[in-house]
Amino acid sequence: EAGIGEDVRRIGSSSASNAPVPKIAGDAAKGVFFTAAYAAADNRPIAKLFNEMTRQRYGIHAPDHDFSQAYDLVRIMEIALKNADLDLSDGALAADRTAIRDAIANVEGYEGLASGPISFCAAPTPQCRDGNRTAVLIGYTKGGENFETEVLARVTMEPDFGLE
């Protein structure tokens, strides 16, 4: 108890999605909201499957955004490696690296766990580099060991948002 009334909004960063936060905060976590690329409260079928897989495999209550981003990274690399024309010989290391980079740049519309489709491109512009611009606003509805969250909003910004 820090003496902060329940009527005061409490905002956290994406790290607030990590399990120790609601476990340590207990009932004080209720009403805290934050943004992250993934919410375990997401109702999409892929999210429900991911949540169940991580519960079974790792014995955790709910996966956080770090779990989801690692999963998406591995899946995107899998797509790129399948599509890259690789030699895999000792003398082809530089060419293979370029082929992998180019294959990643050609991934478009990957529908993973992130809050929106992920696309890459070869252009070195902020619009291309910064990729998905969908933020998810998440709130704790229950704290403690068996914490619960809800998705409060999703906001997708235009590729040029904040660049003017």
Regions found by a protein language model. Give the residues of each.
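Extracytoplasmic/secreted envelope proteins and their assembly/folding machinery
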Residues: N18, A47-N51, V74, E78, ...
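Extracellular/periplasmic bilobed ligand-binding domains
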Residues: E1-A40
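Segments of small-molecule ligand-sensing domains
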Residues: Q56-D64, E78-E150, L163
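A short beta-strand-to-alpha-helix junction
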Residues: D42, P63-L73
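Short, surface-exposed amphipathic charged segments that create phosphate/polyanion-binding patches used
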Residues: G26-D27, K48-E52, T134
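C-terminal substrate-binding/catalytic core of Rossmann-like NAD(P)-dependent dehydrogenases/reductases
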Residues: N43-G59
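Short, low-complexity, Pro/Ser/Thr/Gly-rich segments in the mature regions of secreted, periplasmic
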Residues: A153-E164
